[in-house]
């Protein structure tokens, strides 16, 4: 007999309206993300601007509302002036973060054109590593000021009359990391970010800022960094950045799927730190979170080290090309559940990255088409069906033991209510690798609703991957959920991602 779990989903248990930007992503000038990724002139599937139409279509399928650009570590040695103006006059640069050669063929204008085609906004990251206040202000003037000044007129001269109106700006990237070009102490960075934000707001009061938090929760200055940086910047910024990546280097799948609990704890700790600074400053303002780098990342580490150490200074080398397996898709689904459950404070999130570089979308390096990695599907489902109000489910689940995270629940879930569309979606993962779970869900508050579909992503092989022309992992629609007198009975197969959708009976 299958194990049993119980859950209550009630429209009164509201967490927050979900900001659609939590389904954002990230494109860095790194590896084949830009060149041979979004941009490949001469390819039979590219448009007149050189952008891959098949890639744009897949990004639209994911429905990515915002894309962080141009980095990442890349941005801390980025000279934005190199990326504008006539392409033939743009210089090649040594790209120090990834020991590559940047040709600047795709720059601000080109990327904005691509983002428009993909129905995405651009979240601009500025260089506070090797540069500072003056250059950040010049870049903002170039992008957002209407005209009549040096840099806004330069934009017009370059063929863009109307300002771009970029709204969301990152004040550097991972400035606590010793690997960062221009790495700073917490107070050095806090003061620089504070003064940069103040100056930029004088140019465009409508913009909002993301300030760098810790690069991950294992950094030696974790939490102390947030305290010091926010003590300087709290009154001037809108979001604190979080980053995390997980891997399964020990090949312990059971413990690997517990790492979403670590992400949940990370967010709780950051919220507590933000609220401590809020109290210290006697502020009435909440600090929101931008989880602008998150994913699984470890498969490509050895190959990446070989390229950067033994074959440096290439244009678009195949860096960070993780090929994701099925268990990676399960963890990505679990991480999405965590983000939705924290939608009261997490307002922006970026799956890192989008194309070819630790990405849901890959392009064939031999000139072929594009394909979907296993992680494409949980992200697509969450982005497509996770719009509305996040509901906090009350879950009673059986548990199992892990090697590094103690006893964890078999079932992790969250629900989203889209009142406008009259839809309820439950996202659930059975992370028990051996046993199916019957999930009984009380949905009596949604009177007149019926089961529309139960989508499942599952595989008997946790290590199976997709490849160009070979889609081994893809979702299917099942009959595994029934409804009777306001209670759902759902069979959650072992190691499965589940999307259970309810709609109003008149639809």
Which role does the model predict for each range below?
Residues 1-223, 231-239, 263-264, 268-308, ...:
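Non-catalytic accessory regions flanking glycosidase/transglycosidase catalytic cores in CAZymes
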Residues 243-259:
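Active-site His/acidic residue clusters
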């Amino acid at each position: 007999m299958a194990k049993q779990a119980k859950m209550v989903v009630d429209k009164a248990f509201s967490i927050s309206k979900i900001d659609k930007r939590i389904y954002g992503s990230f494109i860095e000038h790194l590896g084949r993300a830009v060149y041979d990724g979004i941009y490949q002139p001469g390819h039979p599937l590219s448009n007149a601007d050189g952008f891959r139409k098949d890639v744009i279509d897949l990004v639209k399928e994911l429905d990515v509302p915002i894309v962080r650009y141009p980095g990442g570590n890349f941005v801390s040695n980025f000279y934005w002036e190199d990326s504008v103006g006539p392409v033939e006059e743009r210089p090649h640069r040594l790209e120090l973060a990834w020991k590559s050669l940047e040709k600047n063929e795709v720059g601000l204008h080109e990327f904005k054109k691509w983002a428009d085609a993909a129905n995405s906004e651009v979240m601009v990251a500025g260089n506070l590593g090797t540069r500072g206040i003056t250059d950040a202000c010049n870049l903002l003037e170039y992008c957002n000021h209407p005209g009549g000044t040096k840099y806004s007129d330069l934009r017009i001269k370059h063929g863009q009359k109307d300002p771009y109106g970029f709204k969301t700006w990152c004040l550097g990237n991972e400035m606590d990391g010793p690997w960062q070009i221009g790495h700073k102490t917490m107070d050095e960075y806090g003061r620089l970010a504070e003064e940069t934000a103040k100056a930029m707001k004088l140019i465009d009061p409508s913009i909002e800022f993301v300030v760098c938090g810790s690069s991950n929760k294992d950094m030696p200055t974790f939490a102390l960094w947030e305290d010091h940086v926010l003590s300087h910047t709290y009154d001037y910024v809108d979001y604190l950045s979080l980053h995390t990546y997980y891997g399964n280097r020990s090949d312990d799948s059971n413990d690997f799927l517990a790492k979403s609990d670590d992400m949940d704890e990370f967010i709780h700790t950051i919220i507590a730190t933000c609220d401590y600074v809020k109290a210290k400053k006697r502020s009435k303002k909440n600090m929101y979170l931008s989880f602008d780098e998150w994913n699984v990342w470890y498969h490509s580490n050895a190959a990446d080290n070989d390229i950067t150490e033994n074959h440096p200074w290439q244009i678009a080398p195949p860096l960070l090309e993780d090929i994701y397996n099925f268990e990676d898709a399960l963890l990505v689904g679990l991480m999405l559940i965590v983000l939705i459950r924290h939608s009261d404070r997490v307002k922006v999130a970026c799956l890192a990255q989008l194309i070819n570089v630790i990405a849901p979308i890959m392009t064939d390096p031999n000139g072929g088409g594009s394909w979907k990695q296993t992680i494409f599907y949980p992200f697509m489902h969450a982005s497509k069906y996770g719009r509305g109000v996040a509901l906090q489910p009350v879950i009673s689940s059986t548990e199992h033991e892990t090697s590094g995270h103690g006893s964890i629940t078999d079932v992790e879930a969250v629900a989203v209510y889209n009142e406008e569309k009259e839809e309820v979606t439950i996202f659930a993962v059975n992370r028990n690798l051996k046993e199916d779970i019957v999930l009984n869900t009380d949905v009596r508050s949604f009177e007149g609703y019926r089961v529309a579909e139960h989508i499942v992503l599952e595989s008997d092989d946790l290590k199976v991957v997709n490849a160009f022309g070979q889609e081994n992992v893809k979702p299917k629609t099942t009959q595994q959920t029934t409804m009777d007198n306001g209670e759902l009975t759902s069979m959650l197969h072992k190691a499965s991602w589940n999307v259970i959708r309810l709609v109003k009976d008149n639809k």
